[in-house]
Amino acid sequence: MRQGSIVHKTLEDQVHTMVEVEVLTKEDAWGLRIWNIIQGLKTLRDTGMTREMEVWGVVDGLVVNGVLDELSYICPDRELEKATAKSNKDTPSADQTSITNFLDQDSGVIKNLRDIIEKTSRIYLTDVKTRGAKSIPKGASFRPTLMQLMLYHRLLSDLATNKVDSIIIFNRYDLDPAAPFSDSFIAQIGNLNEVFVDASTDPKQDPDIPSPAQDSMQILLEHNSLQSLWSLMILEFKRTMPAGVKSIGNVLKAEYRGQVDGAILGIKTFLYDNKVMQTYLDDEMRWWKGEREAQGVCMEEAYKCGFCEFADECSWRKDRIEEATVAHRARTRSVV
């Protein structure tokens, strides 16, 4: 776990500069989390990539959160996307320009990032997993990662389309959305002197979106509460993903890296499937709300029972043992 965290931290440091900020209140702490998302979206627009961006959502009345390991404008599997384009009108057209077409072949330097963003317009999710083993998971072992990435896609889509009720989030964590941030917090963020500059967006398009001349101090003073800062965050989502859900690519990527050296072990790509995701969520929520019994793992993953802390009291496991015993006795009697 610790080695995996080091790998994630190394990747994050490639994109972001970490600055320590002291918080005095719960609202300050959450304000910092929202501020980091705003900065993450700005980084995505400016550089074409951001990492370790937190997202929140509400699933069947329950608050769910996660951290997106990577967002970028680079499609992880162009062939998969092209294949689905033939049967799905909402996928990119065949003449859509690839980000690689804007790379200088000799130096690999992006020539015109703004042109890339305008032409590709889609953002793709990547989840990074670290492993001690040199192999990557297959079959049932891959399912948790598949569902996790699809859930992150859903959470990001809901934020991009302003479907998340912030009051539910704030109530869940006992936060006062109208409470002003502490002077210390505003001063620290203001001293970072982060200027909101985005040449591709005309500030006249929306008076609520920060103009290029606004710095961190001015922005926080104008959005001096969680509710106000949340509204600014939603505007930044709108700015980054103007087409809403269609701004988010359906090709998802799971990247596996070694725990020790961070070397890439393998990559899996797949498509977001809303029906599969909804079926999974409905079933999980039924268990979470006590509307169904817990279900055990499939035979392929029965090895997990060996280190499960609930193994000794697991009724599902005991039932499977009883079923196997009865079946064995029946076979023995039939042979005799």
Q: What is each PLM-predicted segment?
A:
Residues 1-56, 61, 65-66, 282-288, ...:
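Nuclease catalytic cores
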Residues 18-23, 161-168, 289-299:
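Surface-exposed helix-capping loop/turn segments at secondary-structure junctions
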Residues 34-36, 40, 55, 108-113, ...:
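Sparse, context-dependent recognition of short Cys/His-centered cofactor- or disulfide-binding micro-motifs
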Residues 56-283:
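Mg2+/Mn2+-dependent nuclease catalytic core
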Residues 149, 295, 303:
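Flexible, active-site-adjacent loop/turn segments at secondary-structure boundaries
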